[in-house]
Regions:
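Alpha-helical segment of the N-proximal tetratricopeptide repeat
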Residues: 3-11, 15-29, 234-253, 260
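Canonical positions in the second alpha-helix
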Residues: 8, 43-44, 79-80, 115-116, ...
Length: 364
């Protein structure tokens, strides 16, 4: 385990505590230890780390590493929402709207929805638009609805747009069916290069012309035949075969499979090749090739590559020293779900969570 992080946690760095919790939670550089992970999350949360509060809420909600606990879940969910975590705020909207763990309270749901939309969180902006469109605990206002929908479009991504389109196409999440609005959101996704968005757009246009209406389940099955989904399967298969060959000692075959997976954009394969070309034990060492693969891995979403590039730019190893580029890489890793990036950022600033949110609307 990274001694820097351990030492910083001992000295009271709440983001080092968060990183330790994450590492125990995910089994990174340590044994998987759910109880120790929760202990570190709580230590971090009790000292003011808002992300730790949200992680605890999810742990007690999902029950993946400990038994679900509705009381602990609501405690940490409310704490995370009060601290301004938009994902927690959005979850609280649903809880107050539907009732169950809390008394059903549409007014409270709307108030939390308004707060999360004010943070430019696209999911909140979309449902705020729906609230004004359909009169959910507020007077209908078409102009306000369109304004919020426009904001959601500016801040969202293709996956969200498909979700919005499905809500209007199939009448999900309490939204009235509106095929024209469904087409609008599917087109937004298609314009960003999503073949799922394009397929859904064509499907709705066929329905408008009298064609057969697909169910959501049928739509999902149709997605399985799309080129993007088939490509993901191929590259994952190549990666899996590469790992098997590597474990068995068939290194030439392993490298071949990793290269094929990398050519299809697999982030893990790209990162593996970056490591192999840097180590020089299985292939001849070539740092130029290694850095190229590392760049591509980071772009493809490898948080390991993003953290490593952050360190490279920070220290000026093999690249010109660039503090701003280093911070961007650390923030990118966080946005893609690697909480160790918070510790790296905390060495440069007091509020790394705000820094990340200023750059990324959607943080995993």
């Amino acid at each position: 385990m990274d001694r820097r992080i351990v030492k910083a946690a001992e000295e009271g760095n709440i983001y080092a505590m968060l990183s330790l919790a994450y590492m125990h939670h995910r089994g990174i550089d340590s044994e998987f230890d759910p109880l120790l992970a929760i202990e570190e999350y709580k230590r971090s949360a009790s000292r003011g780390c808002t992300r730790a509060k949200w992680e605890l809420a999810k742990i007690y909600r999902d029950g993946d590493i400990v038994e679900p606990n509705p009381y602990e879940f609501m405690h940490w969910l409310t704490a995370a929402a009060d601290a301004g975590i938009p994902e927690a705020m959005m979850e609280l909207v649903v809880r107050y709207w539907c009732g169950g763990l809390v008394l059903k309270d549409p007014s409270m749901a709307f108030e939390w929805l308004r707060k999360v939309a004010e943070q430019n969180y696209p999911l909140g902006e979309f449902f705020m638009g729906c609230a004004y469109l359909q009169g959910w605990n507020v007077e209908k206002d078409a102009a306000e609805a369109e304004a919020y929908f426009q904001r959601a479009r500016e801040h969202g991504d293709a996956d969200l747009f498909i979700r919005f389109g499905r809500n209007f196409e199939f009448g999900m999440a309490g939204i009235e069916v509106d095929l024209e609005r469904a087409k609008y959101w599917y087109k937004c996704a298609a314009d960003m290069g999503s073949d799922r968005g394009y397929y859904s757009l064509l499907a709705v246009e066929k329905v408008a012309k009298g064609g057969r209406y697909e169910t959501p389940e049928e739509r999902d099955r149709s997605f399985n035949d799309l080129p993007s989904v088939q490509e993901v399967r191929r590259r994952n298969k190549m990666l899996e075969e590469g790992d098997i060959h590597m474990e068995q000692g068939y290194y030439d075959k392993a490298v071949d499979r990793y290269m094929k997976a990398a050519d299809l954009g697999n982030a893990e394969a790209l990162y593996m090749l970056a490591i192999l070309y840097h180590d020089g034990e299985i292939v001849r060492r070539n740092d130029d090739i290694s850095y190229d693969y590392l760049d591509r891995a980071a772009i493809a979403g490898s948080t390991d590559a993003q953290l490593q590039l952050g360190k490279i730019y920070e220290e000026g190893r093999g690249r010109k020293q660039d503090r701003e580029r280093a911070l961007e890489m650390y923030a990118m890793a966080v946005a893609n779900g690697n909480l160790i990036g918070y510790y790296e950022l905390s060495r440069f600033m007091d509020h790394p969570e705000k820094f990340v949110r200023q750059r990324y609307r959607i943080v995993r």
